[in-house]
């Protein structure tokens, strides 16, 4: 069998990893072995945090809605329950946005939720 030389593939693979590691500090951006570990770990963090981001934003929206609804004399859980009973279907992202930027409209929603309870 003829000898197989893999220099071209190895160079391409190394270049790909070093390109991904561009901007990293020190050896992480220059040495293939270290860069490979750094890129792999960065990928793991990115995968994990794409899922964590969804949870964190939901927590943030709930905290904002809770604060705004308590200013109007209703706890978060009772407010959400009232909205469901009043058959008002607005998701938490939009509710949080209304709570921050349009306090008058949020007060109207709280009153409707109170009436439905």
UniProtKB/Swiss-Prot annotation:
Any single GO BP term = translation
Q: Which GO terms describe its cellular component?
A: ribonucleoprotein complex; ribosome
Spell out the CDD domains in the cross-references. Answer: Ribosomal_L20
Alphabetized UniProt keyword annotations: Ribonucleoprotein, Ribosomal protein, RNA-binding, rRNA-binding
- Keyword GTP-binding among record annotations: no
| Molecular function via GO | rRNA binding; structural constituent of ribosome
Which Pfam family is an annotated match for this chain, by its short name?
Answer: Ribosomal_L20
Q: Is Ribonucleoprotein found in the keyword set? A: yes
Disulfide bonding pattern of the chain: none
Summarizing the function annotation, the protein's role is:
Binds directly to 23S ribosomal RNA and is necessary for the in vitro assembly process of the 50S ribosomal subunit. It is not involved in the protein synthesizing functions of that subunit.
By sequence similarity, the record places it as follows: Belongs to the bacterial ribosomal protein bL20 family.
Protein's name according to its UniProt entry: Large ribosomal subunit protein bL20
Species the sequence originates in: Vibrio metschnikovii
């Amino acid at each position: 069998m003829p000898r197989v030389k893999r220099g071209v593939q190895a160079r391409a693979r190394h270049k790909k990893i070093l390109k991904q590691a561009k901007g990293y500090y020190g050896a992480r951006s220059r040495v293939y072995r270290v860069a490979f570990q750094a890129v792999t770990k960065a990928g793991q963090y990115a995968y994990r945090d794409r899922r964590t981001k969804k949870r964190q934003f939901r927590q943030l929206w709930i905290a904002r809605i809770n604060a705004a609804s308590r200013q109007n004399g209703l706890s978060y859980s009772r407010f959400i329950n009232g909205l469901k009973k009043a058959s008002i279907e607005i998701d938490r992202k939009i509710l949080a946005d209304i709570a921050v930027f349009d306090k008058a409209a949020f007060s109207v929603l709280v009153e409707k939720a109170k009436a439905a309870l």
